[in-house]
Amino acid sequence: MELKDRIKAARKHAKLTQAQLAQRVGLDQTSISNLEQGKSQGTSYIAQLASACGVSALWLAAGHGEMNSNKEALPGAPSEKDYALIPQYTARGECGDGYFNDHVETTEGLVFKRDWLKRVNSKPENLFVIYADGDSMEPYIFEGDVVLFDTSKTDPQDKQVYVIRRPDGGVSIKRLNQQLTGAWLIRSDNPDKSAYPDEMASESSVHELPIIGRVIWRGGGIG
């Protein structure tokens, strides 16, 4: 079942018209119609839609678990008590020269265990996932890898990897390395420096970098 089908099923479960559901979540009827027809591939209103329809946000966003949030989940099925749904964006984090994102939209999401998030000292409400694009961060991050980042962690720390907004509006994933002089290198892990040269930032100017968040996990396929 796709997102459009789950939204329609949730609305019917709540016995609401498109107009009634739209009014409850602060959208217009056309927006609900576009979602149910698949014309809109994602929405940042998942939590509001789920609440208005009385269904599980985890189910509505990603199809995990039971539709009815009050219904006991099947053994082994993800539950909202144990798992957090982290919003996924259509924007791709460029591991290269910067991928221009003129619009960022939440679409479905990925789930992570709450106890693991607690161990890494991150709160679900501060987290987002994007997909890496390009090879400048190889071998640490490969093209197509999922990247989880924490928007509450924006202070530069030596050898950490960050999602950074570029001056042209693009988003890049880079590692920050502090030098003995106090200056910082904004660098790619790819050793080909002719293709991916390092950038310098002074000790004072590094704090002016538009850091969106620190990468706390990445994952992808094998081979």
Swiss-Prot record:
Keywords: DNA-binding, Repressor, Transcription, Transcription regulation. InterPro entries: Cro/C1-type_HTH, Lambda_DNA-bd_dom_sf, LexA-like, LexA/Signal_pep-like_sf, Peptidase_S24_S26A/B/C. SUPFAM superfamilies: lambda repressor-like DNA-binding domains (SSF47413), LexA/Signal peptidase (SSF51306). It comes from the Viruses. Residues 7-60 form the HTH cro/C1-type domain. It holds the Pfam family Peptidase_S24. SMART domains: HTH_XRE. Residues 18-37 bind DNA. Signal peptide: none annotated. GO terms for molecular function: DNA binding. This is Repressor protein CI. It comes from Pseudomonas phage D3.
